[in-house]
From Swiss-Prot:
CDD domains to which the protein is assigned, alphabetical: SUF4-like
Compositionally biased region (Basic and acidic residues): 121-131
Biased composition (Basic residues): 1-11
Gene Ontology cellular component terms for the protein in this record: nucleus
Record's function text: Probable transcription factor.
Alphabetized PROSITE patterns for the sequence: ZINC_FINGER_C2H2_1, ZINC_FINGER_C2H2_2
InterPro entries listed in its UniProt record: Sal_C2H2-zinc-finger (IPR051565), Znf_C2H2_sf (IPR036236), Znf_C2H2_type (IPR013087)
Organism: Mus musculus (Mouse)
Entry-linked SUPFAM superfamilies: beta-beta-alpha zinc fingers
Keyword Cell membrane on entry: no
Bias (Polar residues): 295-311, 543-554, 569-583
Listed name of the protein: Sal-like protein 3
Family stated for the protein in its record: Belongs to the sal C2H2-type zinc-finger protein family.
């Protein structure tokens, strides 16, 4: 016996709805009409002779048997067993309550509707099926229609008890989109409370049981019906060849074919209605009809002969369209392939059913896929209220046709749901109980449970759960494949493994050279159609036409659904497809019109392009097939297909649209939330019109404020400035985070003392202002009363102009602020130092002496602690030149700030680099110019920041080396001034007080060592990730990627991830060591320190003469440095001693010191030497009282702190005595006078802006330091060699090792490389 899984309360309702006499009269139900009415609930639809037990769903074709069974029926049986000789027509099993059903009918209908809100319509469908011709094909079923309304009174009594007595379970079988079945559990309490009506008598608990039973059965029936209708529609569409009219049963298919134009379920119902009508004559007719179709399918399988088998009464005569009925062979093939393609066939449903049986069985059954409810039926606020709707969402077909709420106005079955309670629960997820505002939202949500990802990228094959996600993803391919259009239609996942003749998987585009629309050709299932969808047979499946790769032939008007992303697009292909006059259908770049809403269905005249892969290889020739008869409208007629060299999608003309106006459908489309969502998604294609889209990089932001902030990454604008230090930030949040730096108090509230009057200050900014007052004569150089001093300090506001200018220098700083201060990385502000500074050729200038507030802090502290330590200063006098030159270069580079990449190409910079005077006005102007967005992208590739560092004569020894001076500690060995990244030695700094993940420089704690290592790059200025476009360096890959967005790079070049541009092994230290003291050009590629040896007088793009030493080695790597760095070649630097490989020459050089024992970086305070500058910096923190969190995010560059000190030398043991003030006052007065002069000149000229840096060189300084005007830039170059010979007065004074005048020496400073501690 065959197992009939029946869950539709429709049967119960339909029996109730259908008058017993109608049921008997129509279907020849055995037994009295009343009996039929009662039992008709089960047997009414389809063939009235069948009675279904409400408890166990058993089917009985004899009323007496049915009554006998009811006496002994138990709730346990969930499956109805149908006699083998009597194939239970799905319609009978699933009749839905008719709208006119009586209260009891409504109760059952409510149950049914709760099971599936659409079931109400299904009931109508059932009634229509029982009388289907009446509803749609009135020819055969005039009487059945009327019979439906009367049954309600008779039906009520039985359905209630039976329904309420049915067992209840928490588990129901439901179809998920891409799965055969799924188990859903419902709360029984909810269900119990959900049902009302006649069931109340039985008890609240009984109703949930009934509902659950019905749901389980209905789901199974829905699957069967869906498969049946799919096959039927496929057959009607594909086998629509003119032929002898089908016999009565075939006529029904013909009828359906007419309706298939709309491809709406009701059409399928009509198709089946014919057979049902025929079967109405005799109770056994329905099984016969069912068998008949099967018979048809069997012999016809594989054949394209028209369905001539007699499966139904001459009902077909009413519909000449039956000629379009699918050929049995096509039906068989379609049933097997299409059914499989669309959804797994239910075991209960024969895969190859003839069109007749499919139609007949389906015709009796309401279309479960469409939301259908009888207006008269009541829907309870039960979790199962919209079981049918959710079932649709879970059904594989539903994935394609998900958003169809509208119903053809001419089909009463599709009346809108009348229940006011339905809307809330009808979009409730049955798995997680979430409630959604629309069916489409629910269906999308269900994919999270099913894991279905129906949308496939036709370029890379990635799958997505929503079309919106696919659209967003597809934008990645737009730049590389602008000619390939996205496939907006769902591609069943099983097709990924289906071989194609072209070798390209379904849903994937052909190679770019092939037509844009090729993805259509490879898609077997383009449309998201209702229950009956024309699905293209896979190339391997025999079809009426050779559809090797052709898209499915489904009329555009087929979808009454609202425009879900899938269905709407399938509903009407983009208008561009209409341009088939040329014989080649052109698909518009985007299927935007598909989502238009009502217009979607209106764009019916469409012919999909036929690719050469199809049979005939001929392009689709015809345009619209407007002349086709209505029957042909459902599918391309054979003649039309033959006329087209290769089968093309049918072009549906307006006349067909007139037949299926879908007025109500359009309304639902317009109001559908899904359609709105679709329109938003479609706008992605038209995002140029998006008000929140960046016009530079086309990125769409969430809101105008986000867009405004985004533009700052392109313009470099930093509107939020710190009032204390002048730093500017792109966002207020970053500024607030930065304020924490100023709020942080030094560990012991270390006070900075004024070197002139010894007044203590806790704020370096106040100290700086105080010193300015000394210099300006506002305060005498003798200690003043505290009150007066502080009053003056308060009166002197921080120079606003200075802050303004400083804001232009924060790009470099901002990056660190993002990384450390605010942990927000504003990579757009990655610093690139485009300026040339020749520190080696000139003595340190006052601006370099007091270039930053932080330097002042450190300087004052060191002055207090080692003020009289002149001996050590004398020892370091030789190195002072180079050390101070380093300081100057660092300071100058630190001031670049916003100039970094934006004004790198500014002609003004290069022009002024050699001639601009160090004036506040110029520095301000320069900084403002650099801030202008216009200059932001002017990047002169030739203007590379170069720093020449003259290797000084051999320093006395490594122990005496400049604090952070990278110049060689060995006379003959020049050192690349490469800022080596901090090593893990930081983690074990001498103090040992910091945790392993605490920054040894700024004391900032981190969660892990990797984060700490990245953070150290902010101190070392290591920027290993170099942008190949503008050569800016970034400390992290993420920052680089962010930075690349400013270049509008969609596809990141491989060179983007190059590490620091490093010299080849030939340019590494060994080669440089050959010359005793070659002039070193320090190339800062976006903050990376690159040192190369310059040949004599190399021409530099900045127009600045590069000072050259007597013996210079021209580095062939200079030219490459002017171009984007080459792609990284991993580990190209080999250690000759141990064979280890390193990625950069600097790393190799540092490593080699482990073999040589070289420690070129000596602490000038305690004499301890270190192998790396970073280690020395960390060590210097042990000598600093103000090494507080306030210095967080700042890089400490200790540049020969002792050089500043003149006067009597102090023993090391005396450095840390407490009487610093007293000792400071013991210094020769001339020292402080010179110091004041230097400060006056430096601060008065806005030393923090250091226009010298902006100008790319050191302009003439009006200040005389130590008895001589600083030579102009030109003289600097020529005087490089003279620096040590004493020919240059300022340099001579610097080189003097005597302690005659400490003022002649540059002041010791702790300077942050490329950053000024206090200001930036």
């Amino acid at each position: 016996m065959s197992r009939r899984k029946q869950a539709k309360p429709q049967h119960l309702k339909s029996d109730e709805e259908l008058p017993p006499q109608d049921g008997a009269s129509e279907h020849g139900v055995p037994g009295d009409g009343a009996e039929d009415a009662d039992s008709g609930s089960e047997s009414r639809s389809g063939s009235e002779e069948t009675s279904v037990c409400e408890k166990c769903c058993a089917e009985f074709f004899k009323w007496a048997d049915f009554l006998q069974h009811k006496k002994t029926c138990t709730k346990n049986p969930l499956v109805l067993i149908v006699h083998d000789d009597e194939p239970a027509p799905p319609s009978e099993d699933f009749p839905e309550p008719s709208p006119a059903s009586s209260p009891s009918d409504r109760t059952e209908s409510e149950v049914a509707e709760e099971v599936a809100p659409t079931e109400g319509s299904e009931v109508k469908a059932a009634t229509k099926e029982a009388e289907p011709m009446d509803v749609e094909v009135s020819t055969d079923k005039g009487p059945p229609g009327p019979s439906v309304p009367p049954p309600p009174p008779a039906l009520p009594p039985q359905p209630e008890p039976a329904a309420f007595s049915m067992p209840s379970t928490n588990v129901t079988l439901e179809t998920l989109l891409s799965t055969k079945v799924a188990v859903a559990q419902f709360s029984q309490g909810a269900r119990a409370g959900g049902t009302t009506g006649a069931g109340g008598s039985v008890g609240a608990v009984a109703i949930p049981m009934i509902l659950e039973q019905l749901v389980a059965l209905q789901q199974q029936q829905i699957h069967q019906l869906q498969l049946i209708e799919q096959i039927r529609s496929q057959v009607a569409l594909m086998s629509r060849q003119p032929g002898p009219p089908l016999k009565p049963s075939a006529s029904a298919p013909g009828t359906a074919s007419v309706q298939l134009q709309g491809l709406t379920p009701h059409a399928a119902l009509q198709l089946s209605a014919g057979p049902a009508t025929a079967s109405a004559g005799s109770g056994s007719t329905l099984p016969a009809a069912f068998d008949g179709p099967q018979h048809l399918s069997q012999p016809a399988s594989g054949t394209s002969t028209p369905c001539s088998t007699s499966a139904a009464p001459p009902d077909s005569g009413a519909h000449p369209a039956c000629s379009t009925g699918p050929a049995p062979g096509a039906v068989a093939a379609a049933s097997s392939t299409v059914g499989n393609a669309v959804q797994p066939q239910n075991a209960s449903t024969p895969p190859a059913l003839g069109p007749g049986p499919l139609l007949s069985s389906a015709s009796n059954l309401p279309n479960p896929l469409l939301p259908q409810t009888s207006s008269s039926s009541v829907i309870f606020p039960n979790p199962l209220v919209s079981i049918a709707a959710t079932a649709n969402a879970l059904d594989p077909l539903s994935a394609l046709m998900k958003h169809r709420k509208g119903k053809p106005p001419n089909v009463s079955v599709f009346e809108p749901k009348a229940s006011a309670e339905d809307p809330f629960f009808k979009h409730k997820c049955r798995f997680c109980a979430k409630v959604f505002g629309s069916d489409s939202a629910l269906q999308i949500h269900l994919r999270s449970h099913t894991g279905e990802r129906p949308f496939k990228c036709n370029i890379c094959g990635n799958r997505f759960s929503t079309k919106g996600n696919l659209k967003v993803h597809f934008q990645r391919h737009k730049e590389k494949y602008p000619h390939i259009q996205m496939n907006p239609y769902p591609v069943p996942e099983y097709l990924d493994n289906v071989p194609t003749c072209s070798g390209i998987p379904y849903g994937m585009s052909l190679p770019p050279e092939k037509p844009v629309t090729t993805w259509l050709d490879s898609k077997p299932v383009l449309p998201t159609v209702p229950t009956s969808v024309g699905l293209q047979l896979p190339p391997t499946v025999p079809g009426t036409h050779n559809y090797t790769d052709s898209p499915s032939i489904t009329p555009v008007s087929r979808s009454p659904q609202r425009p879900s992303p899938a269905s709407s697009e399938c509903t009407s292909l983009s208008p561009g497809l209409n341009n088939t006059e040329s014989g080649i259908t052109v698909r518009p770049e985007s299927p935007q019109p598909l989502l238009g809403g009502p217009s979607l269905t209106k764009a019916e005249p469409v012919s999909l392009p036929c690719t050469s892969t199809r049979t005939g290889d001929a392009p689709v020739v015809g345009g619209q097939v407007s002349g086709l008869p209505t029957s042909a409208a459902t599918a391309v007629t054979d003649s039309a297909c033959t006329s087209l060299g290769s089968p093309g999608l049918p072009a549906v003309s307006d006349q067909f649209k007139a037949q299926f106006p879908f007025g109500g459908l359009l309304d639902s489309m317009q109001t559908s939330e899904t359609s709105k969502l679709q329109q938003l998604v479609e706008n992605i294609d038209k995002k140029m019109t998006d008000p929140n889209q960046c016009v530079i990089c086309h990125r769409v932001l969430s809101c105008q404020s986000a867009l405004k902030m985004h533009y700052r990454t392109h313009t470099g604008e930093r509107p939020f400035k710190c009032k204390i230090c002048g730093r500017a930030f792109t966002t207020k949040g970053n500024l607030k985070t930065h304020f924490g730096v100023h709020r942080a108090k030094p560990p012991l509230r270390v006070q900075h003392s004024c070197p002139i009057c010894q007044k203590k200050f806790t704020n370096a900014v106040v100290l700086q202002q105080h010193i300015r007052m000394h210099m300006g004569g506002q305060i005498p150089n003798t200690p003043l009363p505290e009150g007066l001093q502080e009053a003056m300090d308060a009166d002197l506001p921080f120079d606003e102009k200075n802050a303004e200018t400083l804001s232009s220098f924060d790009d470099d700083i901002d990056e660190n602020s993002m990384e450390e201060d605010s942990e927000l990385k504003d990579t757009a502000s990655d610093s690139s130092k485009p300026l040339l500074s020749y520190s080696g050729s000139c003595p340190p200038s006052p601006p370099s002496v007091i270039s930053s507030i932080a330097a002042l802090e450190n300087q004052m502290k060191m002055i207090d602690s080692v003020m009289n330590c002149q001996q050590l200063a004398n020892l370091k006098s030789v190195e002072n030149g180079s050390g101070e030159s380093d300081r100057l270069s660092n300071d100058s580079s630190s001031a670049v700030g916003d100039l970094e990449s934006r004004s790198a190409g500014s002609p003004a910079l290069s022009e002024s680099s050699s001639s601009q005077a160090l004036s506040p006005a110029h520095s301000n102007g320069e900084s403002f110019r650099s801030k202008s967005p216009g200059l932001g992208h002017q990047e002169d590739p030739q203007e590379i920041p170069l720093k020449t560092e003259r290797l000084d004569s051999p320093p006395p020894g490594p122990g005496n080396g400049g604090a952070l001076d990278l110049t060689a500690g060995h006379p003959g060995r020049p050192l690349i001034k490469e800022e080596a990244p901090f090593s893990l030695l930081f983690l074990s700094r001498e103090r040992g007080k910091c945790a392993s993940t605490v920054c040894g420089v700024c004391g900032k704690p981190f969660a892990c060592k990797s984060a700490l290592e990245i953070h150290y790059r902010s101190h070392t200025k290591e920027r290993r990730f170099v942008c190949t476009v503008c050569r800016r360096g970034c400390s992290t890959m993420g920052n680089l990627k962010q930075h690349l967005l400013t270049h509008k790079l969609k596809e990141l070049p491989s060179q983007v991830f190059d590490p620091n541009f490093t010299l080849g092994p030939s340019h590494s230290t060994p080669s440089l060591a050959s010359s005793p003291a070659p002039t070193m050009i320090k190339m800062e590629v976006n903050g990376h320190s690159k040192a190369i040896a310059l040949g004599e007088g190399p021409a530099l793009p900045a127009g600045v003469q590069v000072p050259t030493g007597p013996q210079t080695v021209m580095s062939p790597g200079l030219a490459p440095m002017l171009a984007p760095p080459p792609r990284r070649t991993p580990k190209q630097h080999n250690c000759q001693s141990c064979g280890k490989t390193f990625s950069s020459a600097s790393a190799l050089q540092i490593h080699e010191r482990t073999h040589t024992g070289e420690k070129p970086f000596g602490c000038t305070i305690c004499g301890r030497a270190f192998t790396t500058k970073g280690n020395l910096k960390v060590h210097m923190g042990t000598h600093m009282w103000n090494n507080a969190p306030a210095r967080r995010g700042r890089r400490l560059s200790v540049e020969n702190p002792m050089a500043l000190l003149g006067g009597d030398a102090l023993k090391f043991s005396e450095m840390f005595q407490k009487d610093l003030a007293a000792r400071a006052m013991n210094v020769d007065p001339s020292f402080w006078n010179q110091y004041a002069a230097a400060i006056t000149n430096g601060l008065a000229m806005k030393n923090n802006e250091i226009s010298v840096i902006q100008n790319g060189g050191i302009p003439q300084l009006p200040v005389s330091l130590g008895g001589g005007a600083i030579p102009p830039l030109g003289a600097m170059a020529s005087g490089v060699d003279k620096a040590r010979t004493g020919s240059s007065p300022p340099i001579v004074s610097l080189d003097k090792a005597s302690s005659e005048t400490g003022a002649s020496r540059p002041f010791a400073r702790f300077i942050e490389d490329n950053k000024e501690i206090g200001i930036n």
